[in-house]
Regions:
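Solvent-exposed, amphipathic alpha-helical segments
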Residues: 18, 22-29, 76-80, 110, ...
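Short loop-to-helix capping motifs
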Residues: 57, 120-122
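Secondary-structure edge/capping motif, primarily at the C-terminal ends of alpha-helices
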Residues: 84, 115-119, 176-180
Length: 222
Protein backbone atom coordinates (compact mmCIF):
# COMPACT_ATOMS: atom_id res chain seq x y z
CA UNK A 1 0.00 0.00 0.00
CA UNK A 2 1.41 3.34 -1.07
CA UNK A 3 1.88 5.94 1.68
CA UNK A 4 -0.70 8.70 1.65
CA UNK A 5 0.48 11.67 -0.38
CA UNK A 6 0.44 14.86 1.63
CA UNK A 7 -1.33 17.88 0.23
CA UNK A 8 0.62 21.06 -0.44
CA UNK A 9 -0.98 22.72 2.59
CA UNK A 10 -0.11 19.76 4.82
CA UNK A 11 3.51 19.70 3.60
CA UNK A 12 3.81 23.42 4.21
CA UNK A 13 2.40 23.01 7.72
CA UNK A 14 4.84 20.16 8.39
CA UNK A 15 7.74 22.29 7.18
CA UNK A 16 6.73 25.19 9.41
CA UNK A 17 6.43 22.90 12.44
CA UNK A 18 9.92 21.54 11.92
CA UNK A 19 11.31 25.03 11.49
CA UNK A 20 9.50 26.13 14.66
CA UNK A 21 10.98 23.23 16.61
CA UNK A 22 14.52 23.75 15.33
CA UNK A 23 14.41 27.51 15.92
CA UNK A 24 13.04 27.15 19.43
CA UNK A 25 15.81 24.71 20.34
CA UNK A 26 18.54 26.85 18.78
CA UNK A 27 17.30 30.12 20.26
CA UNK A 28 17.19 28.63 23.75
CA UNK A 29 20.59 26.96 23.43
CA UNK A 30 22.58 29.66 21.61
CA UNK A 31 20.47 32.77 21.92
CA UNK A 32 18.56 34.59 19.19
CA UNK A 33 21.44 36.81 18.03
CA UNK A 34 23.93 33.94 17.82
CA UNK A 35 21.58 31.71 15.83
CA UNK A 36 21.69 32.07 12.05
CA UNK A 37 19.10 31.09 9.47
CA UNK A 38 21.57 28.42 8.37
CA UNK A 39 21.59 26.96 11.89
CA UNK A 40 17.80 26.74 11.86
CA UNK A 41 17.41 25.13 8.44
CA UNK A 42 20.24 22.70 9.13
CA UNK A 43 18.56 21.65 12.36
CA UNK A 44 15.23 21.24 10.60
CA UNK A 45 16.69 19.46 7.57
CA UNK A 46 15.70 22.09 5.00
CA UNK A 47 17.23 24.80 2.84
CA UNK A 48 17.21 28.59 3.13
CA UNK A 49 14.53 28.59 0.46
CA UNK A 50 12.22 26.62 2.73
CA UNK A 51 12.81 29.12 5.51
CA UNK A 52 12.08 32.21 3.44
CA UNK A 53 9.01 30.66 1.86
CA UNK A 54 7.52 30.46 5.37
CA UNK A 55 9.03 33.41 7.27
CA UNK A 56 10.21 36.87 6.26
CA UNK A 57 13.06 36.91 8.77
CA UNK A 58 14.36 35.53 12.06
CA UNK A 59 12.38 38.25 13.82
CA UNK A 60 9.22 37.04 12.12
CA UNK A 61 9.87 33.50 13.31
CA UNK A 62 10.65 34.67 16.85
CA UNK A 63 7.40 36.63 16.96
CA UNK A 64 5.48 33.52 15.92
CA UNK A 65 7.20 31.47 18.64
CA UNK A 66 6.21 34.10 21.20
CA UNK A 67 2.65 34.03 19.91
CA UNK A 68 2.52 30.28 20.44
CA UNK A 69 3.93 30.60 23.93
CA UNK A 70 1.39 33.31 24.79
CA UNK A 71 -1.46 31.19 23.42
CA UNK A 72 -0.37 28.22 25.54
CA UNK A 73 -0.22 30.40 28.65
CA UNK A 74 -3.70 31.74 27.99
CA UNK A 75 -5.05 28.23 27.45
CA UNK A 76 -3.54 27.10 30.76
CA UNK A 77 -5.14 30.04 32.55
CA UNK A 78 -8.54 29.41 30.94
CA UNK A 79 -8.40 25.80 32.08
CA UNK A 80 -8.20 26.98 35.69
CA UNK A 81 -11.60 28.62 35.42
CA UNK A 82 -13.19 25.67 33.66
CA UNK A 83 -12.69 23.47 36.70
CA UNK A 84 -15.48 23.20 39.23
CA UNK A 85 -15.17 24.87 42.60
CA UNK A 86 -15.73 28.08 44.52
CA UNK A 87 -14.24 31.46 43.55
CA UNK A 88 -11.77 31.05 46.42
CA UNK A 89 -10.61 27.73 44.98
CA UNK A 90 -10.24 29.29 41.53
CA UNK A 91 -8.19 32.09 43.07
CA UNK A 92 -5.93 29.58 44.79
CA UNK A 93 -5.46 27.71 41.51
CA UNK A 94 -4.61 30.96 39.74
CA UNK A 95 -1.99 31.84 42.37
CA UNK A 96 -0.52 28.34 42.16
CA UNK A 97 -0.42 28.63 38.37
CA UNK A 98 1.70 31.77 38.44
CA UNK A 99 4.01 30.36 41.12
CA UNK A 100 4.49 27.28 38.96
CA UNK A 101 4.95 29.32 35.76
CA UNK A 102 7.65 31.40 37.46
CA UNK A 103 9.71 28.23 37.87
CA UNK A 104 8.83 26.40 34.68
CA UNK A 105 8.51 29.05 31.94
CA UNK A 106 11.10 27.62 29.57
CA UNK A 107 10.54 30.26 26.87
CA UNK A 108 11.09 33.25 29.14
CA UNK A 109 14.65 33.85 27.79
CA UNK A 110 13.08 34.35 24.35
CA UNK A 111 10.84 37.08 25.76
CA UNK A 112 13.85 38.83 27.30
CA UNK A 113 15.69 38.80 23.96
CA UNK A 114 12.52 39.97 22.22
CA UNK A 115 12.13 42.94 24.59
CA UNK A 116 15.74 43.98 23.94
CA UNK A 117 15.35 43.58 20.19
CA UNK A 118 12.10 45.55 20.26
CA UNK A 119 13.97 48.59 21.60
CA UNK A 120 15.82 48.86 18.28
CA UNK A 121 13.18 47.61 15.84
CA UNK A 122 9.94 49.61 15.77
CA UNK A 123 8.01 47.10 13.65
CA UNK A 124 9.02 44.23 15.92
CA UNK A 125 8.22 46.40 18.94
CA UNK A 126 4.63 46.68 17.78
CA UNK A 127 4.26 42.90 17.57
CA UNK A 128 5.82 42.25 20.98
CA UNK A 129 3.83 45.08 22.56
CA UNK A 130 0.61 43.63 21.12
CA UNK A 131 1.38 40.21 22.62
CA UNK A 132 2.12 41.63 26.08
CA UNK A 133 -0.94 43.89 25.93
CA UNK A 134 -3.09 40.89 25.07
CA UNK A 135 -1.60 38.97 28.00
CA UNK A 136 -2.39 41.82 30.39
CA UNK A 137 -5.97 42.02 29.11
CA UNK A 138 -6.37 38.28 29.57
CA UNK A 139 -5.06 38.30 33.16
CA UNK A 140 -7.10 41.42 33.94
CA UNK A 141 -10.30 39.76 32.71
CA UNK A 142 -9.71 36.74 34.94
CA UNK A 143 -8.99 38.92 37.97
CA UNK A 144 -12.21 40.83 37.31
CA UNK A 145 -14.11 37.55 37.05
CA UNK A 146 -12.68 36.29 40.34
CA UNK A 147 -13.57 39.42 42.24
CA UNK A 148 -17.03 39.65 40.67
CA UNK A 149 -17.92 36.06 41.48
CA UNK A 150 -16.71 36.40 45.06
CA UNK A 151 -18.52 39.75 45.59
CA UNK A 152 -15.27 41.42 46.62
CA UNK A 153 -14.41 45.01 45.78
CA UNK A 154 -11.20 45.52 43.84
CA UNK A 155 -8.51 47.42 45.80
CA UNK A 156 -7.34 48.73 42.40
CA UNK A 157 -8.63 48.49 38.87
CA UNK A 158 -8.29 44.99 37.44
CA UNK A 159 -5.91 46.19 34.71
CA UNK A 160 -3.65 47.82 37.33
CA UNK A 161 -3.58 44.61 39.36
CA UNK A 162 -2.78 42.60 36.24
CA UNK A 163 0.10 44.93 35.36
CA UNK A 164 1.52 44.70 38.88
CA UNK A 165 1.20 40.94 39.13
CA UNK A 166 2.57 40.16 35.65
CA UNK A 167 5.45 42.60 36.17
CA UNK A 168 6.31 40.97 39.50
CA UNK A 169 6.29 37.52 37.89
CA UNK A 170 8.52 38.70 35.04
CA UNK A 171 10.89 40.36 37.50
CA UNK A 172 11.20 37.17 39.54
CA UNK A 173 11.74 35.17 36.35
CA UNK A 174 14.52 37.55 35.32
CA UNK A 175 16.24 37.08 38.68
CA UNK A 176 15.96 33.31 38.25
CA UNK A 177 17.39 33.59 34.74
CA UNK A 178 20.41 35.55 35.99
CA UNK A 179 20.82 33.43 39.13
CA UNK A 180 19.57 29.90 38.29
CA UNK A 181 20.17 28.68 41.83
CA UNK A 182 17.43 31.02 43.04
CA UNK A 183 14.78 29.47 40.78
CA UNK A 184 13.88 26.84 43.38
CA UNK A 185 14.26 29.16 46.37
CA UNK A 186 11.08 28.82 48.49
CA UNK A 187 11.30 32.53 49.29
CA UNK A 188 10.59 33.36 45.64
CA UNK A 189 7.47 31.22 45.74
CA UNK A 190 6.37 32.83 49.01
CA UNK A 191 6.80 36.34 47.59
CA UNK A 192 4.64 35.58 44.55
CA UNK A 193 1.99 33.66 46.46
CA UNK A 194 1.71 36.11 49.35
CA UNK A 195 1.59 39.14 47.07
CA UNK A 196 -1.21 37.66 45.00
CA UNK A 197 -3.03 36.40 48.06
CA UNK A 198 -2.87 39.74 49.86
CA UNK A 199 -4.36 41.49 46.82
CA UNK A 200 -6.94 38.98 45.64
CA UNK A 201 -8.17 38.13 49.14
CA UNK A 202 -7.82 41.61 50.55
CA UNK A 203 -11.52 42.39 50.82
CA UNK A 204 -12.52 39.04 52.27
CA UNK A 205 -9.85 38.46 54.89
CA UNK A 206 -12.30 38.86 57.74
CA UNK A 207 -14.56 36.20 56.23
CA UNK A 208 -11.99 33.80 54.81
CA UNK A 209 -8.27 34.05 55.57
CA UNK A 210 -6.04 34.04 52.48
CA UNK A 211 -4.77 30.66 51.40
CA UNK A 212 -1.13 30.18 52.27
CA UNK A 213 1.39 29.39 49.57
CA UNK A 214 1.77 25.80 50.77
CA UNK A 215 -1.96 25.29 50.29
CA UNK A 216 -1.62 26.79 46.81
CA UNK A 217 1.04 24.22 46.00
CA UNK A 218 -1.33 21.48 47.16
CA UNK A 219 -3.99 22.74 44.77
CA UNK A 220 -1.39 22.97 42.00
CA UNK A 221 -0.35 19.34 42.43
CA UNK A 222 -3.86 17.92 42.34
Amino acid sequence: MKPERLSHARRKEQTRERLYGAARTMFLEKGFAATSVEDIVEGAGYTRGAFYSNFRSKQDLLAELLRRDADEAQADLRAIFQEEGSPEQATARMIAHFVHAHREHECFPLWVEAYLLARRDSAFHERVHALRHEKLLHVSAHIQTLLTESDNALPLRADALALGFVSLCEGMQLVSLCYPQSATDPLNQIVLAEFASSVLYRQSMEKTPPMQWRECRTVENR
